[in-house]
Amino acid sequence: MSTSSSNIPYDVGSPRQQSQTEIRSILNPSTTSTGAHPSFNQYHPPTAAPPLIPSHIPLQSTTPSTLGLSLGTPLYQSERDIGYPRDQKPTSNYYDPTSDSSERRPATAESKWSDREAKTSQRRDSYPYQQNQPPAPSTDGPMNLYNGGYKSPVNSHFPPGSPISHAHPQGRVPPLVTQSPRMPAMESPISRHNGLGGGPELQDKPVIKQEPVPASTPSRPVDPMAFSSILSSAAPEPTPKPQPTPTPIVSKPRKASRQPIPTLKPEPSSAPSSRQSSVAPAPQPPTSRVPAKRKANGETKPTPKPKPFTKDQERDIVILMSKLDGEPEDSDVEFAEEKRLYQTRSLKRKLEVEKIETSKTKQRRTDFTNKMAKRLEKHAKAGEERYREVEGDAAISKVQADEIQTEKERKKDMQRKRRREKTVQNNMEQKEIALAKAQAAQDDQERHKFLRDAQRAEKKAQQTKQILARGDKGPEIRAVSPMEPNMQGGSMSTFTAVDPDSTKKPKRGGARPRKSKEQKQAEKDSAAAAQEAIDKGESPALMPIRDAAEFKDMKPLPSKEGVTKIKLKFKAPAEPVEVKEESPSAPVDQHNTKMYHVVYDQIWKDLARKEVPKVFKLAVDSYSIRASNLKKTAILASKEAKRWQLRTNKGTKDLQARAKRVMREMMSFWKRNEREERDTRRAAEKQEIENAKKAEADREANRQKRKLNFLISQTELYSHFIGKKIKTDEVERSTDHPDVAVPDKADHAKPDHGDLPEGTAPAKVTNFEDLDFDAEDESVLKAAAMANAQNAIQEAQNKARAFNKKDDAPAMDDEGEMNFQNPAGMGDVDIEQPKMLQAQLKEYQLKGLNWLVNLYEQGINGILADEMGLGKTVQSISVMAYLAEKHGIWGPFLVVAPASTLHNWQQEITKFVPRLKVLPYWGTAADRKVLRKFWDRKHITYTEDAPFHVLVTSYQLVVSDVAYFQKMKWQYMILDEAQAIKSSQSSRWKSLLGFHCRNRLLLTGTPIQNNMQELWALLHFIMPSLFDSHDEFSEWFSKDIESHAQSNTKLNEDQLKRLHMILKPFMLRRVKKHVQKELGDKIEEDIFCDLTYRQRAYYSNLRNQISIMDLIEKATIGDDNDTGTLMNLVMQFRKVCNHPDLFERAETTSPLSFSYFAEAGSFLREGSNVTVAYSARNMIEYSLPRLIWREGGRLDLPGHDNEHAGVKAKCLESLFNVWKPENIVDSAKEDGAFSWLRFTNTSVQELSTASRKDVFARAVDLVKRPQTLGRLNIVYDEEEDKNYTPVHSMLQIVNRKDRKPLAEVTNEGYLNKLFNVAKDVWGQSGMSRMEQCGRPSATAPPIEVTCSSRGAVIERQKILFNVPMRRALFGPSPVEEKALITSKVSPLFYPPKPMLPLPTSEKQRFTNIKVPSMRRFVTDSGKLAKLDSLLTKLKEGGHRVLLYFQMTRMIDLMEEYLTYRNYKYLRLDGSTKLEDRRDTVHDFQTRPEIFIFLLSTRAGGLGINLTSADTVIFYDSDWNPTIDSQAMDRAHRLGQTRQVTVYRMITRGTIEERIRKRALQKEEVQKVVMTGGAGGGVDFNTRSKENRTKDIAMWLVDDEEAAEIERKEAEQLRYEAENPTASKKGKGKGKKGKEGGGGSLEDLYHEGEGHFDDGSNRPSGTATPIAVDASKKKGSSSRKSGGGGRSKKAKTAKERLAMADGDVDMA
């Protein structure tokens, strides 16, 4: 180890260099002046250690500079190899306490506060406490020569230990400068071995003052291990030859963060440093800049310099030393003993050093090997990269070329394989053909020939199959054993010794040579001639013997696979060949050269290898052919030889068999002939019958056509007469917007009725049944239709007059004009708005009022079919106001509306016409009985003072109280939402038709919902005399327009035009875009969603459970029972599309609780505040009797029977307690045992109190205690004051270094992140929000000890519910925090923060209960995920949403989602009570903070004004598109000023798409019928009820399966056409099944349309119980008891829907 100037330790904090003389004075005892011991005690053994220096380390020079610079902290490896400039001043960012201007002087004995030892100077290193150091050796022991002063050169650097055990370590020589904070200081092992580490304070003898020695003189001999060096004095020896100092090695510059290590530069001793370490005593103490601070820290003046010895003292010392030298008798013995011990120690040290050096050598070799390996690895990688750059493209191209070649070979193999497969197929076909010919052949020879051909073809096919199975085998891959690792070095390489392609197997012999056509033909001719000769009995011409002898000597060997061998024998020539010898004198022939012989030999080899196998193959084939021919000849010869044996009685038997066969064939022929004749005759008869039926059907069709034409003409005439007076078309056209109105087409011509009379019909009125449509002429039918139409008008007017006729004469006004109650023509008088109406009617509403008044004047009923939202209610109220104001007709008026709109009718009548008295007729039976007292009078005259004018009720109550309503005579009956009476077979329709009323007005926004039959029901209701229940008219409405639209488009268009003209006089319809200019647009948008993984799994499972064949069967021949089954499947599929949680909810789960809980009593008695007690107890209980648990059984529980219970506490905690305040004070005064209290900022009382508390209480006290010491880092932030610590807190090192105040000062920004790195990283990692991977399978409270004692219960409660402990862990409650704030308590008195740390998991927190994830709840449904993103955008845009659903359970799930997203919402469905609906709608209209309104499409789609919303979302569409239109018009109606956007959620590729397509078709039907346009492109094919099942089956299948269903249906229709009897039987069965079956698709479409106030099975609480007669009850009960009848409870879906709609009698 070199001790050159480059290895000098440097001071990272000292501002200036120390002089070399000062260093020498500090470290070299020989150059130190005599005096008292310094204040530090550096340990070193008294005897220097021998120089056990390794051989590779040069000896150090013993110059004073070397001695001074060799001691100190060993440098890092990087520091040993780096040289630095000598005059560079070190700079560093670390604080050096030795460079403080207020230098602390060494403490003296007078400055200590204890008499035991002097206080050492306080050093402030980078660590706040001293490092681990060995204790000071004891000088009293006998063997103190070697007591641990030696340390291993391989010194471990451990982090500093705890400051508790080393609060005041023994002094040691501090390092010359403060070391780098990265590693603790370590002494140089070389200097310690050489005895250079001892200080003057470790010398046992007093140091005698000596003269200073020159710098070139060493302080010891060169060899410190010499015996003379041990016994010699400290006198200087002769100067040895100086060793050359190695040149400092200057390495490359390091990073900027490491400052260069400067070389200590000697300075003149006259310029002492102003900032020196307190370790080195300065000759002149400098004046401190801050004396007050040093005084506060307990520092005193330095010790005065000791006086030198006098001459007398020196003389006495010399005398004593001479006396000692004169007694040498024991010196040799002591020397020998010391030498032996020294040699023992030296040997031990040598072995240790060798062991260490050996390990270091291995480590260096390993490091060098790794270094070289890394270096070579870099070269290898560089070479690989270079190779890739140079050869990479070529290698890639070669690989690509090989791949292309391999692909070509593969394609060739595939082609070869296909050709072979084709060959096999052709051979098998030839075999089949040959077998067929053999079966068909009459001759045995031909049959055998074909059989041989079949065998030959089969053999070829088998051979080809074998070749296909064997395939083309490539070269075999040899198994190469893996190479063993090379442990000897050198390079290794492998190569293939033999090329696998070089030893190929010999190829198979080629095929036999192809024959020419002439040869083949000659062979065929010879074979045919041989066959003819054989047939004639002659012997065929065989091959000559001489031809067979050619191959006599050729013997083929058995051939094995892959081996071809031939033996050839050549006959010797008959005559010897004379060989002429060449003359030696002849010239050299050119064929006698070596090349010639090589070529000659090669030719023979080629002949032997190639040509000989071919010849052998030809020979073998020829031999096989010859043997086959011989075999055939032998067979034929044997047959000819046995021909005489065939002459037997076989011919007679064959003749009899032939005769029997002919007889059977003749009999079958005549039977077949007779059957064909009979079938032909029957077919002719059947054709005649069919022709007759067809002619009859044509006649009936013509008759029905004329009958229908008569009915339509009659209706058209009636409409024409009424239209002239009502002028509905003018009313509609006058209110059309010119920009959007549809212009009249020229071809949309009205029927030409000519000049029709206005008065009474001159012709005779003919009943419909009396007309003969076969004999009558068209003119006669037209005249009868005109007469009937005029008669119908006259009957309507007479009926109106009869209703208004009273007992007295009709009232006339003063001018004698006719009263309005007497119907008459009013001409073109325009009616003004009534003054009673407190509202301003719009133009189109005033036109509607004129139209309604004209209807009333003519005594004709009508349908006001304005689009929803145009004010049909206001127009109806204005009619009643007009009648009351102009003509004094104050009622009674009857308004029947759905239950959801009753409040709306009452409010609007009261609001617009306050003078009209409204009687709300709903409630319980008792309430309605009281209400009937106001109007149940026979001769009441309704004037302005009448008890009521308008009665408002619902459809259900009209049906239930029909007996009371029929007693009244109603002036005007208004039916709101008239589609409720669309069924003419329901009891509701029949009951309302039987009311006595002058006029009926139907209000509906959708007159056509599902089919034309509904429109027919409405027309029949308003004009029973004209639109009566003729089957033909009903047939025309329901079938001709719908079913024949596809087949007869022209007829369909004509009928639609005529239908539109018929409807014109009775129905007034305006559309929003035509009449309401200020109404915003309505935009409809379909949002397609995809199924999630969970939904697809559910959907696939449902599809897999459906049998497609069953669907096809049900779709073709099924009835309504099958419809119910299919509808159940449809509902399941719709549930999957909405949300999979409709099938199975993700439940809240928790581990098994191995405990039981107390049962709670009734909460009804507890009031609003319920006390929930802790009652969880383990299933395992440890029961103890009271005698053991409370009465003397426990040793720690004091009592009258346990006198020894408090002995331990009394002795240990009271008598022997060293923490008592008195003991602490006395100990501090006497021996100073508690003297450290003054440096810990702790009082005696605090220490005594802490000793009596447990760990938790002490932790609480620490939290409450203010931590102000760490704030000094903020106050004292200068460099020189950075480590300032008050004296009273000197030992509170951790609190002084606390960084929390710095973090509290910076609450935000990057500095805050730096102080909270762990917290910031944890938060960004997302670990706290991750789902838990596992959880315990079971939990249980701790096992408790049970005892029948109140004291045991109290003790357990105190343990479990410790209030102070809970308050410390959880902090104050929110109520207490609020009280502290409201009371304005100072923050100093606030309770401490909660001590319980935050949970690691933000989701799970401290519990194991797992709640279903709402995020997964959203993402499990494709619809809900789309809706989530859509609602976020709508919320940001300030929109308000109406959200419609079909399923109540889906609304429940949506409520959970809205709660999760914190959206405010309201809900209205069928279960909402009637009185709550008004308040709910009012809240949504008046409170803008409500974002979403959840509605049921059936319950919330009628009679509600929700114009405050501008967005409508259909989560799932209704079966009936009209219901959706009514629902969206709740927002898009009169009063809406914003644009309304309608979103419809549809799941792609599911049943919802097919339902939506069907709904669009129905909407198109409505548009065509209402507008009267062309309907050629409209699908009117709504199937009949008998085959309605097909529509549902089509929803459940895909396109291919739908095509299969269509095909099966076509086959069924063809079968029914061919077998009419079977089809009639099937229809009968279907009809019977229909009567007992469930609901059909039609019922599904109409589901809930009439029961508007109830969208679910739960009653709303407002319905009235229906009274049933006793006789009916009795009859029903008897039927039930007999088993033949059904209970009153609806069993099928159809019955339930009918009851809900009121279509059937409740009895």
UniProtKB/Swiss-Prot annotation:
It is an enzyme of class 3 (hydrolase). A motif (DEAQ box) lies at residues 976-979. GO terms for biological process: CENP-A containing chromatin assembly; chromatin remodeling; DNA repair; positive regulation of transcription by RNA polymerase II; regulation of TOR signaling; subtelomeric heterochromatin formation; telomere maintenance via recombination; transcription by RNA polymerase II. It is found in: Nucleus. Residues 78-89, 101-126, 516-526, 729-756, 1643-1656 have a biased composition (Basic and acidic residues). Residues 505-515 have a biased composition (Basic residues). One of its GO terms (molecular function) is DNA binding. Transmembrane segments: none annotated. Keywords: Activator, ATP-binding, Coiled coil, DNA damage, DNA repair, DNA-binding, Hydrolase, Nucleotide-binding, Nucleus, Phosphoprotein, Transcription, Transcription regulation. Residues 603-728 form the DBINO domain. It catalyses: ATP + H2O = ADP + phosphate + H(+). Residues 1426-1586 form the Helicase C-terminal domain. The modification Phosphothreonine is found at T178. Its EC number is 3.6.4.-. Its main location: nucleus. It comes from the Eukaryota. PROSITE patterns: DBINO (PS51413), HELICASE_ATP_BIND_1 (PS51192), HELICASE_CTER (PS51194). ATP binds at D866, E867, M868, G869, L870, G871, K872, T873. Residues 61-75, 266-281 have a biased composition (Low complexity). Residues 15-44, 90-100 have a biased composition (Polar residues). The keyword Nucleus applies. The DBINO region is involved in binding to DNA. ATPase component of the INO80 complex which remodels chromatin by shifting nucleosomes and is involved in DNA repair. Belongs to the SNF2/RAD54 helicase family. This is Chromatin-remodeling ATPase INO80. It comes from Sclerotinia sclerotiorum (strain ATCC 18683 / 1980 / Ss-1).
